């Protein structure tokens, strides 16, 4: 497959039938490992916030964060730490988390991955530009702070977040529904593209019938993403253009 300059990239795998057969109305992006690297700000903040809130240390290195939702991660940490997973405890935990994630973002050397800003610019400049949204396991305010740290939050009109569900498939469904409300139409699955860096991102995109892009900048290797059979699998977003995924 060739890029917009005609160069062939062996890092790209595309399905034979993934050419856009109809308009793409909504493109949904995961955040961590897909849009940005935060230098581990989220993981560090989770461990520190749990100890600050409950006086219990939980080894976050034993917990798999990639492709997860914040609410499900909090539930797992409660299980490890012997803390009741109540709404009150969750609210207390995330109040500490947001304070700490700000500190870690300020100290981190993170930023957007290669090709991200160009892709967002290209999508926004298309004649019939799709709406841009988020499909993330972050709580909404955590997402705002992570993307805001790198000037990207205002690029997105809507999103599905951890508040919508602990189940990523249901977050995807919520994001699609919000996209339909934003566009004032009923969206069909193929009118949506989901971009993410883990098998869970690809799976939730398929759950709503969307076209899927696996990008190997975060939680999974290119080979692992290819095994999930997304519509596109790329090393990073420099190897894909807006017209590749949206047509035109």
Task: Name what the model sees in each region.
Residues 1-25, 85-88, 117, 121-124, ...:
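Asp-based, Mg2+/Mn2+-dependent phosphohydrolase catalytic module
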Residues 34, 41, 140, 200, ...:
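Conserved Rossmann-like nucleotide-cofactor binding loop
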Residues 15-16, 23, 28, 102-134, ...:
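Short, acidic loop-to-helix structural element flanking the phosphoryl-transfer center
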Residues 38, 42, 112, 165-171:
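Phosphate/oxyanion-binding active-site loops and adjacent basic polyanion-contact surfaces
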